[in-house]
Amino acid sequence: MNYLPTPLNEQPLEGSFSIGLQTRIVLHAQTGELAKTGAKQLKEELHRFAGFEVPILRGEALNGDIALQLASDLPAQGYRLRVDPQGVTVAGADEAGLLHGVQTLRQLIRKSGCELSALQINDAPKLLDRGYYLDVTRGRIPKLSALKALADSLCFYKLNQLQLYIEHTYLYRELTELYRLGDALTAEDIMELDDYCAARGIELVPSFSSFGHLFELLSTKGYASLCELTAAAPSTMPNRMRHHTLNISDERALPLMRAMIAEVMPLFRSRRFNICADETFDLGKERSREELARVGERAYYMGFVKELCAFVAEKGHQPMFWGDIVQRFPDALAELPQGTICLNWGYSPEEKEDATRRLAQAGALQYVCPGVNGWNQWMPPLRDGYENIRRMAAYGKKHGAIGLLNTDWGDYGHINDTLFSLPGLVYGAVFAWCDADASFDELNAAISRVEYLDQSGKVVGLLAQMQAAYACKWYSLVHFKDFAQGNLEVGFDELAGCTDEQAARCNAHLADVMAALRACTPAMDSSTRGMLQAWVVAGEAIRLWNLVGAAVAAGREDAALAAALERWFESYKQLWRATCRESELSRLLDVVTWYAQLLRQGKQG
């Protein structure tokens, strides 16, 4: 694979083109702002990888120039890239297509420098909506600079939509009880990111919880009476995942959600709005039990979703919502406003086609929504992510989905660094763009070369091997701690399976992988070698927590391991703070501290 995503058609031509002193990047008169973005990106790429400072101008291209122009004979978002001895032409069906063509040219320049082999590429996407969905709620809120860097990556791999998952991490003007949680995104943050994304052809779509997953809001004094559950629950990582759902039988519920939606909607250019409405686990469990029993789950759930979608539509926006609940009664989709998009999620590496087929048969306008599978992991299980994304993309194309939204969640404190999700991001970009069924190894080698500038093509394949190094999973450690502290109703014996033998076996495999990663650094460009330290921090996390799990399962004291865990966390904090706000890093510190103390006393007590 020479390009990511793989072009539809590539034809070699005779000769080559040399970037020279008189080469110019020429914007044709009819081009707009996205073309200007592309020109600036090309200028930077040429300086870095071809060694030439190439000026940008607007007008008619001459021999020896790089021309950026529009062409009416191409499909939506399509482009044509031609390199011949007279120069380079990137033609786009529209501004988006032109920018996509520039990304392919950037990758060609990375590979070839100032001497470009003659060729012609004709290309267009299979799915017009290709997105990435980032959790900024469950512990980790990236700095604005990191979100902009993410937008740059989306643009480079021809993704055109970004959604940020928000529950309580936006600074609502009236919800002041949430301010104590700290580091929330502000209106200015969102508007600045929206501008940045728009300049790169990316639609920043608002995504705000408005039914389930409202734990922090419904735990406040002011809004606890709107919670479905009557008793307060401790703010633990598992509880945040499972609770709280809005009591929609309360007449105050709908106006509150409408007001929250209305406050954030104007911050975005997008004419879409994701109300979420997923995993309403507590629906009808306590305060609205009688109402649910009276009308039934379908009418009760869909009634509120219909009200929210209607409100969004009245505001001139296209509603979106997660489709896990409506899967139980897909014919109810007909009750929603025309054009409502159902977000069909499924994250298993063995995900089946049934849900996608069922929604298509019900007439749903749907996105397929796989996941990078990095949540709860120090390093994402790349094989699982690849298999899941590949399958879901294929199902979507087969059953007429209009888009793919690749998810990156942060369950249980968001230990997974977004930097490590990049291979999964690319998997989604590749399978949403084209039909090429790239093998796992082939795709990883291409990502190694294109993203990490690794001439050996090995680094991503080695990262994938870390999936086999876990003897003890993070969620097991969290469950064990919460149960011991009386914050879970049922016990978890998951640590019982973590033995010294298993930890030793996994850590021996991990040591081999880390040694091989270190050996790859001479083949990497100096600008990407800094990733090695981040990968080592993740590898050390896996190694140490394997040992912690085994020691705790055996009831063994190990003060040296406790100290090693605390030293590692200092490195982890540095990695976190390089790209993220402080957010809820303290929650992870609580887990580290609890286990360090347990290791020093050898048993619970």
What annotation goes with each model-predicted range?
Residues M1-E14, S18-L21, A35-A39, L81, ...:
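Substrate-binding groove of N-acetylhexosamine-processing glycoside hydrolases
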Residues E60-A61, H168-T169, S210-G212, V326, ...:
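Conserved beta-strand edge residues that scaffold enzyme active sites
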Residues L128-G323, E335, I341-L343, G396:
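Substrate-binding cleft of carbohydrate-active enzyme catalytic domains
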Residues T104-L127, C155-Q163, G222, R271, ...:
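Conserved oxyanion/phosphate-binding beta-strand-loop segments in alpha/beta enzyme cores
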Residues Q30-T31, R138-R140, S348:
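A generic structural motif
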Residues M1-R130, R391, H414:
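Contiguous, structured surface segment used for ligand recognition
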Residues L57-D65, Y170-R173, E177-Y179, P330, ...:
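Beta-rich nucleic-acid/ligand-interaction surfaces
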Residues L119-T137, Y367-N376:
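N-terminal small/glycine-rich loop or linker at the start of catalytic domains
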